[in-house]
């Protein structure tokens, strides 16, 4: 009887300690809910103009600027009125390459609705336009996206002629059969703001969904891929891995064999 009486308080203490530890874990998880594997603050870092010195002096100046910042091309001209179109006050920015986060007045003349900017030089009227005809104050131009290169059969010895490289950048466009069907391959066009945009063949859409690496336009992705040196950036590259949504997904092995071949896609429609 005495041994049982001594054991009960010890069990109660351990149960109470485990309950306190579990409660503290819940509180800390709710307070510090930042996932260290999530994508870094790529969308929060201010854009950097290509050719400008790095704004950091704590060691980050040795890193690639496009890892955290959107690199924009240098502006032509020295200020407002140097060939840029005016912007009507209150309208959304006409850019989608990172410049939409910059103050519009840095490059454009801000025009109030229904008025003409003071001191702005009137553009010459086209020959077919008569005086008195209202002219548009701002123009939104849609940028054309180059179509994705056609995929070619790789063969068993494709890895011997292709070279590996690292890629990173923002997803500009998505193409391939995976854009229409869960069973098709997904091609992404990425732009790092410095080099010409490239097309990369990732994997079937169901495999990306199963691995948690679904990509969308505007996302920052990076990884490793194989490229045919005879085609350079004009051809279709083949990804070995991709990091998206904070997840790192292996897509192909060193012989360019898709890892989804042994994964199976029986329940892909349910994911």
UniProtKB/Swiss-Prot annotation:
Keywords: Biomineralization, Heme, Iron, Magnetosome, Membrane, Metal-binding, Transmembrane, Transmembrane helix. The chain crosses the membrane at residues 11-31. It is a single-pass membrane protein. GO terms for cellular component: magnetosome membrane. Heme 1 binds at residues 65, 68-69. This bacteria makes up to 20 cubo-octahedral magnetosomes of about 45 nm in diameter which contain membrane-bound crystals of magnetite (Fe(3)O(4)). A motif (MCR (magnetochrome) 1) lies at residues 48-71. A motif (MCR 2) lies at residues 87-110. Heme 2 binds at residues 104, 107-108. Residues 1-10 are cytoplasmic. The lineage of its organism: Bacteria, Pseudomonadati, Pseudomonadota, Alphaproteobacteria, Rhodospirillales. It is found in: Magnetosome membrane. Its cofactor is heme. Belongs to the magnetosome MamX family. This is Magnetosome protein MamX. Required for correct biomineralization of the magnetosome, may be involved in redox control of biomineralization. May function with MamY, MamZ amd Mms6. It comes from the Bacteria. Binds 2 heme groups per subunit via the 2 magnetochrome (MCR) motifs. It comes from Paramagnetospirillum magneticum (strain ATCC 700264 / AMB-1). GO terms for molecular function: metal ion binding. InterPro entries: MCR, Multihaem_cyt_sf. Residues 32-271 are lumenal.
């Amino acid at each position: 009887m005495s041994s049982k009486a001594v054991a009960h308080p010890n069990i109660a203490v351990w149960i109470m300690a485990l309950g306190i530890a579990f409660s503290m874990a819940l509180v800390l998880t709710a307070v510090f809910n930042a996932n260290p594997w999530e994508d870094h603050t790529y969308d929060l870092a201010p854009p950097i103009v290509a050719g400008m010195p790095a704004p950091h002096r704590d060691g980050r100046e040795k890193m690639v600027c496009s890892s955290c910042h959107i690199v924009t091309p240098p502006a032509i001209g020295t200020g407002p009125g140097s060939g840029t179109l005016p912007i009507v006050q209150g309208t959304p920015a006409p850019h989608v390459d990172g410049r939409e986060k910059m103050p519009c007045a840095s490059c454009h003349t801000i025009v109030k609705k229904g008025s003409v900017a003071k001191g702005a030089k009137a553009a010459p009227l086209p020959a077919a336009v008569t005086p008195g005809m209202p002219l548009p104050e701002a123009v939104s131009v849609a940028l054309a996206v180059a179509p994705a290169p056609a995929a070619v059969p790789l063969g068993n010895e494709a890895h011997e002629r292709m070279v590996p490289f690292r890629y990173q950048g923002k997803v500009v466009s998505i193409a391939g059969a995976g854009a229409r069907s869960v069973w098709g391959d997904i091609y992404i066009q990425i732009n790092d703001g410095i080099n010409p945009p490239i097309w990369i063949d990732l994997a079937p859409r169901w495999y990306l969904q199963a691995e948690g690496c679904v990509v969308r336009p505007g996302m920052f992705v990076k990884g490793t891929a194989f490229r045919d040196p005879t085609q350079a950036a004009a051809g279709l590259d083949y990804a070995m891995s991709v990091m998206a949504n904070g997840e790192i997904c292996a897509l192909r092995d060193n012989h360019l064999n898709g890892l989804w071949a042994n994964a199976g896609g029986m329940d892909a429609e349910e994911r």
